[in-house]
From Swiss-Prot:
Keywords: Cell inner membrane, Cell membrane, Magnesium, Membrane, Transferase, Transmembrane, Transmembrane helix, Ubiquinone biosynthesis. Its EC number is 2.5.1.39. This is 4-hydroxybenzoate octaprenyltransferase. PANTHER family: 4-HYDROXYBENZOATE POLYPRENYLTRANSFERASE, MITOCHONDRIAL, PRENYLTRANSFERASES. GO terms for cellular component: plasma membrane. InterPro entries: HB_polyprenyltransferase-like, Prenyltransferase, UbiA_prenyltransferase, UbiA_prenylTrfase_CS, UbiA_sf. GO terms for biological process: ubiquinone biosynthetic process. GO terms for molecular function: 4-hydroxybenzoate polyprenyltransferase activity. It is found in: Cell inner membrane.
Amino acid sequence: MTAGAPSKFSLYLQLIRWNRPAGWLLLLWPTLSALWLASHGFPGWHLVTVFTLGTFLMRSAGCCINDVADRDFDRHVKRTAQRPVTSGAVSVREALGLGAVLALLAFGLVLTTNAVTIAWSFAALAVTLAYPFAKRYVSMPQAVLGVAFSCGILMAFAAVQSRVPPLAWALLLGNLFWVIAYDTEYAMVDRDDDLKIGMKTSAITLGRFDVAGVMLSYLIFISIWAFALIQRAQSAIFMIAIALALAQALWHGWLIRKRERDDCFKAFRLNHWLGFTVFAGVALSYWGR
């Protein structure tokens, strides 16, 4: 290793986006919300630990898979050209090996739950593996990512109730639209580069209606979660949280209105606070019951 060159360990941390926690927090908050809803309150430290660590591990594994799949495209995109796999600092074999280890660790956590959750974990893995390749063939790959990022909701209900009730599917549908909203903001950052290399994204598909599409997706997400949970939560705290989430969505719309790269990326990064707001509303609505 030459002087000043990053160590392998630091390169692996870059690969899994260790310094960018917003990505896994976007996965965590709806999953924890589902855990609290399925349990009608605090689900216990075992499940909180399993799903918190599992979310981090699987998102990290997904980064490894995504960077391997996209390495020939990423070198043509300003924001991703220096990623470890793309630059050659980490080999494809190393990235896949690290991803496999992380996925196996996550599966080890799932094994401490029940058979229904274990079965759903295979479906979640399949969607996770499919997403990087959807960007080549699907005009709205963000919808595929939405399913992948929402599987934790189904698994949370399965872990608590040993089944996946209709409520879980409603929450998954709503969450899918949230993912479309924030990942379209993300795609707006790279749109010029993606057009040159032939990558398919919702930002390209929506064209001049991209901002409207983002705002409509936010509205659908918040509406579905509000209507699905209003009877269950039965709390002014939850409704305040929904109002705050809506206010954040409107702010994001203001940020992206001019389609500036930095503002679109800022809106994307701040989305985890919107997710946290909804989770806090759910968790606090059960507090003290």
